């Protein structure tokens, strides 16, 4: 993305050739397929509807009201940013709004295909228009602002408004390339290829794509963890469950033509690189020794195929971080087999004010975690640690049995979690071995991305009074899903029907409260730029609500009601003048000021000035750290080592609180 173009007679010739190419798309309207349901879709549709209504934890009625919700979701999934359809299109689709419930039950998918075919044509028209905008060089001197997120705006009234949206969209794409150091001929060539590739992918759309999208519009209206997987995606899911894929260890999704990183697999290559984060966008993928391919607008499965490869090989990714004015950068990652056993728990000892504090990092609840943790605790006990921090940040969960077994390492016996099914039946999972692996001061560090099994463990430690929970409010994913094939043994279809994943149970703490939606609220909260009102289960549409049941029979081990305020006061005094927490508070302030800004300038000077300020602020922060460490300042950002890591101030503070905890226990 950073290669430069030297002007010459050859360059001028290439520019002219590109201009001709721009006005002539490689595909005609007739190349866009008119898709129709396949024979197996009727049966699959009725079975999906029947399965959800009969077996889902959430009891719902598939009626006209629910039909309207599915309709709105389907339109949103087809044109989330309201940049392809106009208001007349949407009004015409409205005839189907109250009919989808009956169609889902009967297996009639005609509405879904009629709507999808219209959207395909509208997408073709928009990309055709985008190509015409590349006939002449785009200038970035005017005052012009691009609306980034149009989802809450009204639908465009007509093609004139859509044309203006796309004029700005093309200018936005071109300016991003300009800011990455490209000259106009290369910008033109890149965007011509990008938009023609987008049209090409329209021509490669299959009926299975339509059916999967439609079924997921239905599924997401039931709850956010319910989904339909097409036969191809179901096969990929099984491969992942068998741990046979080799790649970078990232969960991807498509959002407004971008391949976005939804989450990172703990212990995987991407997470280990520490250069990629959830929310980042992959805009280019290249193989070792080959040119990076622009993947904006690509199908997700095609991007995944580019990223996957043999273990030990390298993949080059162009990354555009989250944020309106972010600068892209390139990361090289060595592919590896993504195996659960590679995400093992590990421990280390940190010394603070004469106290030895063990830190136990648990990236996921893999099978065998409790046994690994027991071994690590033996090591920590041998080193006579004064306390232990269990680090569950970014731990998305895993095996429920391991959450129960892990809890058992810190209590003698007792209930750990309650599980209720859709019939109201409650099962209590607990520990009964009467053995404790560590009985000293214990803290649990969580963040907003600690979910599921992580929340079960943290909640149990909190309810028993066995540990003090630190950090951020956790994610709030307190449900159990089941994965089932739609096929029956007696089916005679040539093609499989796909699979469904749906919610069947809900978790409850031993105090009776659910972890669903609310998550676990820490005893001592850390400053964070992550707003629980904007991230987590509670933000998801149709998330199951928090509720409570009767508490399980358990005995509280400790009551820290008087100790927590003392530790919290020491924590506040410590971070008040702490430089790193000062940086965090600056970030929180900046985020609050900028989070509702929904436009970005298309003026080059303005954008360059914004980026220069961001770079200057970052360099100043880095050099404040260097000065505090007694090290030489960086001359510029290029001088910063590629493997530079910022201090883990949250973990450092958790260690300090645990040391305070140990002191208080001794006194």
List the predicted regions and their residue ranges.
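Conserved functional hotspot residues or short segments at active or partner-binding sites
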Residues: 180, 184-193, 509-667
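Acidic/histidine-rich, surface-exposed loop or edge segments in extracytoplasmic proteins
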Residues: 25-33, 45-57, 95-99, 193-197, ...
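N-terminal-proximal low-complexity accessory segments that begin disordered
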Residues: 37-79, 87-89
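Extended, domain-scale alpha-helical bundle/helix-rich regions
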Residues: 122-247, 253-256
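Cleft-lining beta-strand/loop regions that shape enzyme active-site pockets
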Residues: 36-37, 50-62, 200-207, 223-235, ...
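Gram-negative bacterial Sec-dependent N-terminal signal peptides
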Residues: 3-21
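PDZ/PDZ-like domain segments forming the peptide/carboxylate-binding groove
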Residues: 76-77, 98, 112, 117-128, ...
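Polar, glycine-rich mid-to-C-terminal structural blocks
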Residues: 465, 470-533
């Amino acid at each position: 993305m950073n290669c430069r173009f030297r002007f010459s007679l050859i360059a001028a010739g290439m520019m002219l050739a590109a201009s001709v190419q721009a006005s002539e798309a490689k595909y005609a309207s007739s190349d866009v397929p008119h898709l129709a349901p396949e024979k197996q879709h009727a049966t699959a549709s009725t079975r999906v509807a029947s399965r959800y209504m009969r077996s889902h934890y959430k009891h719902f009625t598939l009626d006209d009201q629910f039909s309207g919700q599915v309709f709105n979701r389907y339109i949103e999934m087809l044109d989330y940013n309201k940049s392809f359809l106009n208001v007349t299109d949407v009004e015409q689709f409205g005839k189907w709004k109250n009919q989808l419930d009956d169609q889902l039950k009967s297996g009639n998918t005609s509405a879904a295909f009629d709507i999808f075919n219209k959207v395909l044509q509208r997408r073709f028209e928009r990309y055709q228009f985008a190509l015409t905008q590349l006939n002449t060089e785009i200038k970035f001197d005017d005052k012009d602002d691009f609306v980034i997120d149009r989802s809450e705006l009204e639908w465009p009234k007509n093609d004139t408004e859509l044309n203006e949206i796309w004029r700005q969209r093309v200018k936005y794409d071109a300016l991003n390339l300009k800011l990455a150091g490209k000259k106009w001929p290369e910008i033109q060539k890149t965007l011509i290829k990008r938009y023609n590739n987008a049209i090409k992918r329209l021509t490669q759309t299959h009926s299975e794509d339509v059916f999967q999208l439609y079924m997921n519009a239905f599924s997401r209206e039931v709850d956010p963890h319910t989904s339909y997987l097409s036969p191809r995606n179901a096969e990929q899911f099984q491969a992942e469950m068998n741990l046979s894929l080799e790649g970078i260890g990232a969960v991807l999704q498509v959002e407004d033509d971008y391949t976005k990183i939804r989450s990172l697999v703990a212990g995987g290559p991407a997470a280990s690189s520490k250069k990629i984060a959830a929310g980042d966008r992959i805009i280019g993928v290249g193989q070792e020794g080959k040119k990076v391919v622009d993947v904006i607008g690509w199908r997700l499965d095609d991007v995944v195929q580019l990223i996957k490869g043999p273990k030990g090989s390298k993949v080059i990714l162009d990354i555009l971080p989250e944020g309106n004015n972010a600068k892209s950068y390139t990361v090289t990652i060595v592919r590896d087999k993504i195996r659960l056993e590679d995400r093992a728990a590990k421990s280390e000892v940190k010394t603070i004010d004469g106290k030895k504090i063990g830190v136990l990092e648990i990236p996921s609840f893999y099978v065998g975690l409790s046994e690994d943790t027991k071994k690590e605790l033996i090591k920590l006990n041998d080193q006579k640690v004064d306390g232990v921090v269990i680090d569950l940040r970014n731990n998305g969960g895993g095996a429920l049995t391991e959450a129960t077994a892990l809890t058992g390492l810190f209590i003698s016996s007792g209930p750990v979690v309650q599980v209720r099914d859709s019939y109201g039946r409650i099962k209590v999972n607990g520990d009964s071995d009467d053995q404790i692996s560590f009985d000293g001061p214990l803290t649990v560090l969580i963040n907003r991305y600690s979910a599921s099994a992580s929340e079960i463990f943290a909640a149990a430690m909190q309810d028993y009074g066995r540990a003090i929970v630190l950090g951020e409010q956790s994610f709030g994913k307190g449900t159990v899903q089941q994965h089932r094939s739609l096929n029956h043994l007696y089916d005679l279809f040539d093609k499989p029907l796909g699979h469904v994943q749906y919610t069947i149970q809900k978790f409850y703490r031993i105090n009776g409260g659910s972890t669903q939606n609310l998550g676990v609220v820490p005893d001592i909260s850390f400053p964070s730029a992550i707003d629980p009102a904007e991230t987590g289960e509670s933000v998801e549409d149709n998330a199951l609500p928090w509720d409570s049941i009767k508490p399980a029979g358990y005995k509280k081990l400790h009551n820290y009601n008087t100790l927590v305020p003392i530790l919290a006061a020491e924590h506040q005094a410590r971070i008040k003048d702490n430089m790193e927490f000062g940086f965090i508070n600056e970030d929180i302030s900046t985020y609050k000021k900028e989070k509702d800004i929904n436009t970005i300038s298309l003026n080059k000077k303005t954008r360059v000035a914004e980026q220069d300020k961001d770079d200057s602020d970052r360099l100043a922060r880095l050099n404040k750290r260097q000065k505090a460490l007694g090290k030489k300042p960086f001359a510029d950002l290029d001088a910063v080592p590629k493997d530079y890591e910022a201090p883990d101030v949250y973990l450092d503070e958790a260690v300090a609180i645990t040391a305070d905890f140990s002191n208080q226990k001794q006194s």
